[in-house]
């Protein structure tokens, strides 16, 4: 976990409620490449923003600091009231700082190097129709 600061209530940059952004693979090919790489290496690899895109946005009454504290004792999916698939990425953003978690076979792990802004610029690739 990385060190976070408690954002004061009076901070003008603070967003209430916080945003929960869920990222998924931008294409089936990106998902397959990721899965095959994990299998061939025999271990999980971190998420690469160029392979992901924003799939859903929700709201959360906790700020990033409180969320990071609570996930130590409460399951992520219970806090967010959502079921996430393997290798999805979730970001809780309160306007000042983010907590980014990556779902692995062993549970959620922090993914502070995931470039969420880059992933939000990507678009989901549509399947090409067969000619």
Tell me what each language-model feature is.
Residues 2, 54, 68, 116-124:
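General helical secondary-structure elements
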Residues 22-24, 51, 64, 101, ...:
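Intrinsically disordered, low-complexity N-terminal regions enriched in serine/proline/glycine
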Residues 1-59:
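Extended boundary segments
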């Amino acid at each position: 976990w990385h060190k976070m600061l408690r954002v004061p209530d009076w901070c003008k940059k603070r967003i209430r409620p916080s945003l929960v952004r869920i990222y998924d693979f931008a294409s089936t090919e990106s998902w397959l490449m990721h899965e095959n790489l994990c299998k061939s290496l025999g271990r999980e690899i971190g998420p690469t923003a160029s392979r992901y895109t924003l799939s859903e946005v929700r709201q959360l009454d906790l700020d990033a600091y409180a969320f990071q504290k609570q996930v130590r004792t409460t399951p992520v999916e219970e806090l967010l009231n959502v079921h996430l698939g393997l290798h999805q990425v979730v970001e809780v953003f309160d306007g000042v700082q983010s907590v980014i978690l990556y779902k692995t076979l062993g549970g959620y792990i922090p993914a502070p190097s995931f470039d969420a802004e880059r992933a939000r610029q990507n678009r989901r690739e549509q399947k090409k129709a067969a000619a």
